[in-house]
Amino acid sequence: MAADSQTPWLLTFSLLCLLWPQEAGAFPAMPLSSLFANAVLRAQHLHQLAADTYKEFERAYIPEGQRYSIQNAQAAFCFSETIPAPTGKEEAQQRTDMELLRFSLLLIQSWLGPVQFLSRIFTNSLMFGTSDRVYEKLKDLEEGIQALMQELEDGSPRIGQILKQTYDKFDANMRSDDALLKNYGLLSCFKKDLHKAETYLRVMKCRRFAESSCAF
């Protein structure tokens, strides 16, 4: 990839890092509304980062004429599509807060391993020179969700232990068409799963605190 094409990646990632909530990873005792606000903010930043990464990877590696057919083939690629998690806001509103938190935790934990290999597919890009930054952000969100679960624990069965699964690692062989398609698919799933987690958290926050920002 040409040096000029790396610039948007670097600028986007740098901006998101600057906007990331301070004292990341720390969830001291605080009001429930603050726990939800922090978790939602982290999920929003991660979803935006995933969406921008997917878009830039697509622009750099996937010919425009092939994108539509490839995207259709990716529909059944994400393992998260095989679990009984809500697929949108309306379905999420029919689930309890604890169910949504457990699905959110499952989605986040499924990416903790794969994101540690991101730097291997972006070896010429400063954006993912250290993939542990993305890993740390996922860990921050994981801790935030776990803090909420502790506050709302209701004794219901834990689905995460039954459905827990992870994605394959990203493929570093960027000269292979198969590897490019695999990484493209993984980034698509990363974006979709973080969008789901963000949606679940926002639904919970809105129905508990009836905010004007609930229209999303």
Swiss-Prot record:
| Main localization category | secreted
Q: Where is the signal peptide?
A: 1-26
Q: Which Pfam families match?
A: Hormone_1 (PF00103)
Q: Which UniProt keywords apply?
A: Disulfide bond, Hormone, Metal-binding, Phosphoprotein, Secreted, Signal, Zinc
Localization, UniProt: Secreted
**Disulphide bonds in the chain:** C78-C189, C206-C214
Q: What is this protein called?
A: Somatotropin
Q: Which gene encodes it?
A: Gh1
